[in-house]
Amino acid sequence: MTETTPFVRPDVALFLQFLNAAPGPKFWEVPAAEARAITSAMRDVADAPVGELAVIRDIDIPGPAGTIPARVYDRRADRGPGPVMVFYHGGGFVIGSLYSYEPYCAEVARLLDLPVISIDYRLSPEHPFPAPAEDCEAATRWIASSPAELGLNVTGLITSGDSAGGNLTIVTSMALRDKPAAVPILVQFPIYPVVTLDPDWPSMRAFSSGYLLTEEGMAYFGEGHAAVPGDYRSEPLNFPQEGMPPSLVTTASLDPLRDQGLAYVEKLKQAGVKVQHISADGNIHGHINIRQAIPSVQADVEGYINALKIMLAEVSPAA
């Protein structure tokens, strides 16, 4: 298939047909509070059930501007020392929540057989740049210290998140590279990340209308987040990546952000970082949240976690 007639999976095509014909306002046409409600409602109709898990509990993490809520997922009620995944949700720094990412985090906890801690960082526009990044760094450092309130003996970290959360994954990993936490980051796992404010990419032109993440949606997020150009937290692609942890980076072939994700993979390679790239061919941005509406996504998620397990075993055999 050419870029003008890209390959689209049949179940992705059906979902897009439904989404693009759906009545009512789009999230970028309403205030942030209403946009967040739309996101929560989408989980209820498009994502898989949370399913059974031994542990789903809420904790409070001290942050730079007050308490940061978080949620712990674990398939085991009793967990010995080991790594944990710290997860930063997507949503353009404006939408998304613990609730909207609960099915995905629970599934990862089951597949990975490690605790997953989802961070409910402050959202823009109420808390613009760099508040989300500040919260994520603070929360990750706190988790790394194995505080009694966490109830886990943390030996290493996996930083992960999707879209805006992919950005937060990378910039948190950069911050901990430059000023290490109590335990190391074993692997960073950004999922279709945003790594630059530069909109001039072929995939941005090809897929910015009709493929879930739209030009209007990206403008809405950009205005709300008010990121400062030239800061490593807004444009990590433009900053050195030497010394970063082993990295698993995923992109989607129908994603406006695809090409900047690929550029980040190349940046890591040039910096001598161990990196693996997985492309979800025929799939769209945001797919980890729509496993029920797009059944083929389950295989994508399982493939990501299998690759992550292999990478973890290589960098930390005791993990």
Feature names for model-found ranges:
Residues I294-A319:
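Catalytic active-site module of serine/aspartate enzymes centered on a nucleophile-bearing elbow/loop
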Residues M1-V72, L312-A319:
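A glycine/proline-hinged amphipathic helix-loop "lid/cap" segment
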Residues A144-T159, K179:
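Gly/Ser-rich "nucleophile elbow"/oxyanion-hole loop immediately N-terminal to the catalytic nucleophile
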Residues V249-T251:
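Short beta-strand/loop motif that positions the catalytic acidic residue
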Residues H127-P147, Y304:
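Alpha/beta-hydrolase active-site loop
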